[in-house]
Amino acid sequence: MLFRSDWLRRLQTDYIDLYQLHWPERNTPMFGEFVYDPAKERPFTPPRETLEALAELVDEGKIRHIGLSNEWPWGLMQFLNAAREYQLPRVVSVQNPYSLLNRTWETAMLEFCHREQIALLPYSPMAFGLLSGKYLRNPQARGRVTEFDGFAQRYSKPGVPEAVAAYAALAEAHGLSPAQLALKFVYSRWFVASTIIGATSLAQLEENLNAWDAPWSEALEQAVADIRLRWFNPAP
């Protein structure tokens, strides 16, 4: 497996705590897709071979744990079965999208990972910044959504603008910023191990961190559930 020691030197570390595989190599719904299409089938490296290569890095002390990203139940099951059958390192986490607009995780992946004790590390809790409300105020506001054409396909689906507006109004009614509501929702989920946040300014970073101490109530939980039922998972 290609893993250059100078990568660790450039990172100024002796090892990587969690080494994640960013995307499945096989045919599976990605980049805003939500339907599996067998017609797109293509060859892929068996999970056992991948784990064997990663096991060498674990044995060498270059990485400590292995995680997956953008994964589905079948793929995760293959990695867990290979680890169990061939005494290879076990996957400890999955980094998948999770937010008020994308709660796909709560179906099959939630039960699977809870029973297998696999941690969720959600990314895009702010849905590419949409849940900050900035695009409601200025549709051409600077950001990935406006600067990179086609970059945020899952957030261009029907129902997304309406859901964003509803969550922003809910936040205002409870004395929160839209960003605080979006992040506190993710922080308050019992199955979330840690959250990946992003910021382009110190002010944004401060707001992200302050969301941890934002209040969360049963009334707020119910209001979020009501909005979800109206615009159900608009950005899978």
What are these regions (language model features)?
Residues 16-18:
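Metal-dependent phosphodiesterase/phospholipase catalytic core, i.e.
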Residues 5-14:
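Phosphate/pyrophosphate-binding loops at sites that engage ATP/ADP/AMP, CoA/4′-phosphopantetheine
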Residues 1-2:
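Short, small-residue-biased leader/transition segments that mark boundaries at the very start
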Residues 21:
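Surface-exposed loop and adjacent secondary-structure segments within mature catalytic domains
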Residues 24-227, 231-235:
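Beta/alpha (TIM)-barrel catalytic core signal, keyed to glycine-rich beta->alpha loops juxtaposed to Asp/Glu
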